[in-house]
Amino acid sequence: MIDSTGLKVFGEGEWKVRKHGKERRRIWRKLHLAVDSNTHEVVCADLSLNNVTDSEAFPGLIRQTHRKIRAASADGAYDTRLCHDELRRKKISALIPPRKGAGYWPGEYADRNRAVANQRLSGSNARWKWTTEYNRRSIAETAMYRMKQLLGDSLTLRDYDGQVAEAMAMVRALNRMTKAGMPESVRIA
C-alpha cells in the first residue's frame, strides 16, 4: 500500500492561510510511504521536496525494500508508465486505478489494461476496486494518520538532510508502536 503526505517545515498555520491567504515562505516536504497490509508496518519511506510528484518518487521507494512483494496498491497519481515499468521490473502486480477515460497501453501492461477494460465495461473504477480489494489501500492512509496524530505533522529541522533523518526517525517510532500492538476495536450495538 503506497501513498504520500505532506509535512510542514515552516510557514503559517492552516487557519491563517484560510483567513488571510498564503505567504511565499511556506515550505513542505512530501513523505512517501509503503505499508505492509498485513502487519501495518512501514516497509520503506522516502522524503522529497514538495515539487516531486508521487510517480517520480515511486521507483526509488520500491527499490528500497528487499521483501517479496506480490502486489502494490496506489492511487491514480501513480498511473504512469514509470510506475508500471518499475512494478513489472520487480515482478509486482499493480493495483493502480487508471485515470478517467484512460486508454490501453501497448506491450506488457496486462494489469493496467485489465483495469482499463473493467473501467470501460462498468463505466467507473468501482467494480475493479471491489474485485481487487483495492480498498485495503486505506491502510497506508491510516498509517499516515497515526503518524501525524502521534508524532506531529511538521518537521523542526531546517537542513534537508536533518529533515530526512527526522522523518525516518518518525517512521521508526511509528513501526515500534505498531509492533507493540495495534488497538483492537469491537463493535458495540
What are these regions (language model features)?
Residues 24-30:
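Short, flexible loop/turn motifs enriched in small residues
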